[in-house]
Structures are given as C-alpha cells and as structure tokens.
C-alpha cells in the first residue's frame, strides 16, 4: 500500500484469546498521514486511545501481520 499526505488509515488489532479481551490487543486506531519521507510516513493519531500522538511508519510495512501471541494487526485505507 502506498500512502500520500492527507490519507486516513486505520490500524486494527484483534486477538481472540480470553486473556487479551480487555487490552490494546483488541483496539482500533485512526491515523492521518501528515508527512511522506523517502523511508517513512509521518502519522498523527486522530482517533482511539492514542489520539493526539504522532509516530512514524516505515514505507515497507506489512498490511497484515500476526505476532507470537496471536494478535493480528491490519492496516486499511479509509
């Protein structure tokens, strides 16, 4: 997925295990792309528990991935 300045994307995390039911392993964050560099995208969180924070996302990010605990993370373009 290639992003441009002004795009809105969502990061959706899901984990079906009971011990993760009330944690950030089951969360949804909405970001706005505020900067595009040669290697990263600059993001500002505009919705969710991290609203108002900024971060960088590497350009080669995986649109869908899973970790060792079974949490599936998916990035979607809104």
Roles of regions detected by a PLM:
Residues 1-4, 76-78:
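Short intrinsically disordered terminal tails
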Residues 2-23:
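Short coil-to-beta transition motif at edge beta-strands of beta-rich domains
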Residues 13-14, 39, 63, 77:
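Intrinsic disorder/low-complexity segments
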Residues 18-59:
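Basic/aromatic-rich interaction segments and small domains that mediate binding to polyanionic partners
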Residues 46-78:
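Intrinsically disordered, low-complexity, charged/polar segments
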């Amino acid at each position: 997925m290639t992003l441009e300045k002004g795009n809105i994307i969502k990061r959706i995390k899901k984990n079906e295990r009971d011990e993760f039911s009330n944690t950030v392993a089951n969360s949804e964050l909405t970001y706005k792309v505020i900067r595009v560099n040669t290697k990263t995208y600059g993001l500002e969180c505009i919705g969710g528990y991290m609203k108002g924070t900024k971060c960088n996302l590497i350009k080669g990010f995986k649109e869908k991935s899973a970790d060792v605990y079974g949490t599936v993370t998916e990035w979607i373009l809104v």
